[in-house]
Swiss-Prot record:
Specific enzymatic cleavages in vivo yield the mature SU and TM proteins. The CXXC motif is highly conserved across a broad range of retroviral envelope proteins. It is thought to participate in the formation of a labile disulfide bond possibly with the CX6CC motif present in the transmembrane protein. It comes from Macaca fascicularis (Crab-eating macaque). This is Syncytin-2. Ortholog of the human HERV-FRD_6p24.1 envelope protein. The genome contains a high percentage of proviral-like elements, also called endogenous retroviruses (ERVs) that are the genomic traces of ancient infections of the germline by exogenous retroviruses. Although most of these elements are defective, some have conserved a functional envelope (env) gene, most probably diverted by the host for its benefit. Glycans are attached at N133, N146, N177, N220, N241, N247, N312, N332, N443. The gene is ERVFRD-1. Residues 1-15 form the signal peptide.
Length: 537
């Protein structure tokens, strides 16, 4: 009876417990089921704890290149020779700001998020930029790219204004040029490159085409029914299904290819009027970086993973998804239970043949060439990558908080320094008055320290749970998964032992009563006198 109560108490608690890897494993199981993999049931799903290879990259399909949305981050820099021209330059900048509300957004966090990432499969599209003095983000080998677009390394884009054109919206006179191997693309006359309806015309006016241009079909990424088309006017990719009508899905405001090429460009605002003269020296420069707006998608550049590409980036990149290493083992294998404790104790290693998740899916062959048959699998796979993106966002918020606090405190310190210099102007400033070196002390905010303290507490909690032996929940869950199949039969046997004697006694009494009743009926029939009258002849 005590064991039954223990099972009834622990079962809801253990059912509510969720291992930290459960979201990823659940998404992996959904992915296996959606692709009809033979490993969707009766198998082991294992995650790797190795830090040498933090994950695997999976390239996006050609159709996803037409649907994943990008965004631009704009900052500007004044020309150092603006002495005496700040007033008209500010007037011009205020006009531009009204037409471009994204100016001076909070800059994204650049740099590789992960390194030593392995790209599985062949990327359908890659983009190469070779800029002088550019920021190298990583380079994919040409052998893993099906089609490679190269951004013109020598192009510089300028925007010229007259005094009467200040009220007009700025845009690129021409898009950044991209080149590709001769004979790679085919001219196609189609209605899809004339421009689809877009809800962001007034916001992203730099992408308005100056005139209509025919599309170029990418043959080795297309099929007879589905085309992948390139519009060189806007550096945009379109997907067209020839078996359907013209009213197909709209494309994003800023596509990945457009954002990647724009981020390699240079834009300067150069007013030309009787006030400024005819010089084409830009008054200020725009620095444009690009990020992927679709959560879970990343730039894959060599073995590095990026959320954003900086201004004037250089390298060879594609887009795709990232997941931690998840392996599959057949369900008939007996896996050893990991034991937490002294990590220095030797552990016996068993030769277990693990299958990578992507190999178990059987969809790698279709990513680099075709565009059909993997839509559902790719969508489910992207959910795995979103789990990583959420963790990255959390780290990014902490780093952003650090940057904001440093900027805020630096402004306060500089303001106080100016005030002290004014009070001690007669002595030549505070530094000369004290006859000391000018030093600054920036006191870090407690908000940042609280975030770091929480991270440390979480890490400490994980270490404690890993060293508590079999009493910790994580270890309990691991051995409980082995015991779980035996709980049902054990509970059934326990119930049988508890209520079996009672049931047996009831059955015995019922049988005895029925036998007694039959016996009484038989005895009564034998003692009754016969009432038979003989008929006379």
């Amino acid at each position: 009876m005590g064991l039954l109560l223990l099972v009834l108490i622990l079962t809801p608690l253990l059912a509510a417990y969720r291992h930290p890897d459960f979201p990823l494993l659940e998404k992996a199981q959904q992915l296996l089921q959606s692709t009809g993999s033979p490993y969707s049931t009766n198998c082991w799903l294992c995650t790797s704890s190795s830090t040498e290879t933090p994950g695997t990259a999976y390239p996006a399909s050609p159709r996803e290149w037409t649907s994943i949305e990008a965004e631009l981050h704009i900052s500007y820099q004044w020309d150092p020779n603006l002495k005496g021209l700040m007033t008209p330059a500010n007037s011009l900048l205020s006009t531009v700001k009204q037409d471009f509300p994204d100016i001076r957004q909070k800059p994204p966090i650049f740099g590789p998020i992960f390194t030593n990432i392995n790209l599985m499969g062949k990327a359908p599209i890659c983009v190469t930029a070779k800029r002088k003095n550019g920021t190298n983000v990583g380079t994919l080998p040409s052998t893993v790219c099906n089609v490679t677009f190269t951004v013109d390394p020598n192009q510089q884009t300028y925007q010229t204004y007259t005094h009467n054109q200040f009220r007009h919206q700025p845009r690129f006179p021409k898009p950044p040029n991209i080149t590709f191997p001769q004979g790679t693309l085919l001219d196609k006359s189609t209605q899809f490159c004339q421009g689809r309806p877009s809800s962001c015309r007034t916001r992203n006016f730099w992408f308005r085409p100056a005139d209509y241009n025919q599309c170029l079909q990418i043959p080795n990424l297309s099929s007879p029914a589905e085309w992948v088309l390139l519009d060189q006017t806007r550096n945009s990719l379109f997907w067209e299904n020839k078996t359907k009508g013209a009213n197909q899905s709209q494309t994003p405001c800023i596509q990945v290819l457009a954002g990647m090429t724009i981020a390699t460009s240079y834009l300067g605002i150069s007013p030309v009027s009787e006030f400024f003269g005819t010089s084409l020296t830009p008054l200020f420069h725009f620095h444009i970086s690009t990020c992927l707006k679709t959560q879970g998608a990343f730039y894959i550049c060599g073995q590095s993973i990026h959320q954003c590409l900086p201004t004037n980036w250089t390298g060879t990149c594609t887009i795709g998804y990232v997941t931690p290493d998840i392996f599959i083992a057949p369900g008939n294998l007996s896996l050893p239970i990991p034991i937490y404790g002294n990590s220095q104790l030797p552990r016996a290693r068993r030769a277990i043949h693990f299958i990578p998740l992507l190999a178990g899916l059987g969809i790698l062959a279709g990513t680099g060439t075709g565009i059909a048959g993997i839509t559902k699998a790719s969508f489910t796979y992207s959910q795995l990558s979103k789990e990583i993106a959420k963790n990255i966002d959390t780290m990014a918020k902490t780093l952003t908080t650090v940057q904001e606090q440093i900027d805020s405190l630096a402004a306060v310190v500089l303001q106080n320094r100016r005030g002290l210099d004014m009070l001690t102007a007669a002595q030549g400033g505070i530094c000369l008055a004290l006859d000391e070196k000018c030093c600054f002390w920036v006191n870090q905010s407690g908000k940042v320290q609280d975030n770091i303290r929480q991270l440390l507490n979480q890490a400490s909690s994980l270490r404690e749970r890993a060293t508590q032996g079999w009493l910790n929940w994580e270890g309990t869950w691991k051995w409980f998964s082995w015991v779980l199949p035996f709980i049902g039969p054990l509970v059934s046997l326990l119930l049988l032992l508890l209520f079996g004697p009672c049931l047996l006694n009831l059955i015995t009494q019922f049988v005895s009563s029925r036998l007694q009743a039959i016996k009484l009926q038989t005895n009564g029939a034998g003692c009754r006198p016969r009432n038979i009258q003989e008929s006379p002849f």
